[in-house]
């Protein structure tokens, strides 16, 4: 390792996903020098489909619309649809970096392996060049950590799981419908990814079952002819009491989607706004057509059965 290089008043930004890019851009706008470090060969973080630990799959689209996703000082192109694909989102981030001159401050294939305090309220940042295997340490006035949270997949454990004769895959390893094509599939979990995978499985697998521990509010992407987050924004602008807002949102959901229990889905055991929103236009549709069969939480595994 070489001697420590003092970068004076410069800041280091760890990660070149959306938060890392915006942090780098704002530091530069404040007149500060800054270096951005990204372990992959391109920016975008989770939205870079080809990145080593990207969790997006071929069919991934935003669950929020352009006005609620784009940077306020750099709108998404007018030609983009309401819910852009991950390819479009990644192109947007590259355009953002080009527009604000960020590429000259970004270091790719550069993995930050340690950040340690240094005398004088400074920070030593050690970076591994993944192309050469060499490390170098630079000292900064400050560090912004923007390396994301979708890194290590967690698979729950159930009794008898080690006896299961089928495949067990985490959604982190799901990239396309080829994973489920022609198979009997059980999708576990009703987060946005779980719902997306269940829908793709319904379209491509032999049979699809969907196991959830609880009921959820499955919000449509469109309500009353417009994107649902824009409809929701109109209701939120009324600044009504929380209890009344919950009544209104559940009423809108019942009018636009229906009674979940009549579809065989479990009744939510929590109130609106108490969990991360599930936005999926198609899950209830495929449940209603019998292509997705709702199931409760897993109790145990037994050989080839669950």
Task: Set out the residue ranges of the language-model regions.
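Flavin (primarily FAD) cofactor-binding/catalytic cores of flavoenzymes
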Residues: 2-62, 75, 81-222, 226, ...
């Amino acid at each position: 390792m070489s001697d420590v290089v003092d970068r004076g008043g410069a800041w280091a930004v760890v990660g070149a996903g959306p938060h890392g890019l915006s942090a780098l851009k704002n530091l530069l706008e404040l007149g500060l020098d800054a270096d951005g470090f990204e372990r992959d060969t391109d920016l975008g973080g989770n939205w870079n489909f080809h990145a080593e630990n990207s969790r997006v799959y071929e069919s991934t689209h935003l669950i929020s619309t352009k006005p609620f996703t784009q940077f306020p000082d750099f709108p998404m192109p007018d030609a983009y649809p309401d819910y852009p694909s991950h390819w479009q989102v990644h192109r947007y981030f590259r355009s953002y970096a080009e527009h604000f001159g960020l590429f000259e401050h970004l270091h790719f294939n550069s993995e930050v392996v340690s950040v340690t305090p240094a005398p004088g309220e400074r920070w030593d940042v050690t970076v591994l060049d993944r192309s050469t295997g060499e490390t170098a340490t630079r000292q900064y006035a400050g560090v912004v950590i923007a390396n994301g949270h979708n890194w290590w997949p967690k698979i729950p454990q159930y009794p008898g799981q080690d006896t299961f004769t089928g495949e067990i895959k985490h959604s982190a390893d799901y990239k396309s419908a080829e994973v489920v094509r022609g198979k009997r599939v059980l999708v576990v979990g009703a987060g946005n990814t779980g719902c997306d995978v269940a829908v793709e499985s319904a379209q491509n697998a032999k049979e699809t079952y969907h196991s959830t521990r609880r009921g959820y509010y499955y919000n449509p992407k469109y309500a009353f002819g417009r994107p649902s987050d824009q409809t929701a924004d109109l209701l939120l602008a009324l600044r009504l009491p929380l209890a009344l807002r919950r009544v209104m949102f559940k009423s809108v959901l019942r009018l636009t989607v229906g009674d979940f229990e009549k579809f065989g889905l479990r009744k939510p055991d929590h109130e609106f706004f108490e969990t991360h929103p599930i936005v999926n236009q198609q899950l209830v549709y495929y449940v209603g057509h019998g292509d997705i069969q709702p199931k409760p939480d897993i109790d145990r595994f037994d050989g080839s059965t669950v």
